[in-house]
Amino acid sequence: IEEYLEYITYYIKDGKEYTNNERGKKRKLSALKSFYNYFFCMEIISSNPAALVPLPKLHEKEIVRLDVDEVAILLDQVEDGTKLTKSQLKYHNKTKIRDVALLTLLLGTGIRVSECVGLDINDVDFKNNGIKIRRKGGYETVIYFSEEVSEALHDYLEKRHHIIPLEGHENAFFLSIQNRRITVRAVENLVKKYASTVTSLKKITPHKLRSTYGTTLYQETGDIYLVA
């Protein structure tokens, strides 16, 4: 059994390479243990060697997120751009209001980047401070936001009204510098650009901003179900 576990760590079958991490090996060993246990209980075999093999321990990955001070520094960096390169600064004045709104929205609501880029102008309700988003699976839901998020979105929308979008992108809330609906990749690069000026020890992605939001929400409410 131990040789089997060593084998499935990396093997080639029908010309294809296969690997299994700790989680994959634990899943396969659990199935093997159940198989042996059944035959042992049915007295088909006289011993159960699988019972002597411990399940692999899963090493939990550290959750990477920004702390409160880093969030403040991140948003300050988006506004002033003091640590950006010369080439990045060329576009900074054109995009900083949009970038502040986008990052404030991600940090303030915990929505996915795909949900963020999919926002249309009519999806934002400033009267009730809510946005209508489309979740995985196609269903719609309303997420509410704070006054801070509302102010950032208002500032961007005021500028957005003076931009003429390309045909087919008229309804998009967030636009790229090419006046198209901004893409997931563009937001990922945007987050990476600003986050690198705040911390070089953490690899911050839009998903990590969701972790930051979730952690903050849990610390404020103590309700894990709200975070989920």
Regions found by a protein language model. Give the residues of each.
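Conserved catalytic core of the tyrosine transesterase superfamily
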Residues: I1-A228
